[in-house]
Amino acid sequence: MIDQLQGTWKSISCENSEDYMKELGIGRASRKLGRLAKPTVTISTDGDVITIKTKSIFKNNEISFKLGEEFEEITPGGHKTKSKVTLDKESLIQVQDWDGKETTITRKLVDGKMVVESTVNSVICTRTYEKVSSNSVSNS
């Protein structure tokens, strides 16, 4: 499953980002910039370490982790979280915990596109990406 997600992906659509960012407590000005962002995501592996790099005009973010192991992360929204990523048959599932809140980010392939569903409380933001490159993404 992780092999299929490796590569570089560009955002082609986003649904419900305003409500999602508001639920996260992100301010109005940052939400406005966030709505304009069309991020590019690169997923790569080096042995058992997975790296996800997200780049946009608004912010860049990079996380590296091993499946099932907790790690600290500072989100693009500025939250310091305890995060854990697991893999099931269909999805890469990331759970972020901070200040008594929990966010779940699910990455999966649907018809050759990467669909990322981010959920906080009952608010879901869905962003769809298309693959632009699968070159030079694995160092293992």
Swiss-Prot record:
An annotated GO BP: fatty acid transport
Keyword Transport: yes
Pfam families: Lipocalin
Gene Ontology cellular-component terms listed: cytosol; nucleus
Binding site for a fatty acid: R107, R127, T128, Y129
Keyword set, alphabetical order: Lipid-binding, Transport
Entries under Gene3D superfamilies matching the protein: 2.40.128.20
InterPro entries linked to this entry: Calycin, Fatty_acid-bd, ILBP, Lipocln_cytosolic_FA-bd_dom
Domain of life: Eukaryota
Recorded GO MF terms: fatty acid binding
Keyword Transport set for record: yes
Tissues in which the protein is found: Expressed in a number of retinoblastoma cell lines.
Family of the protein in this entry: Belongs to the calycin superfamily. Fatty-acid binding protein (FABP) family.
Protein task: May play a role in lipid transport.
Name of the molecule in the record: Fatty acid-binding protein 12
Origin species: Homo sapiens
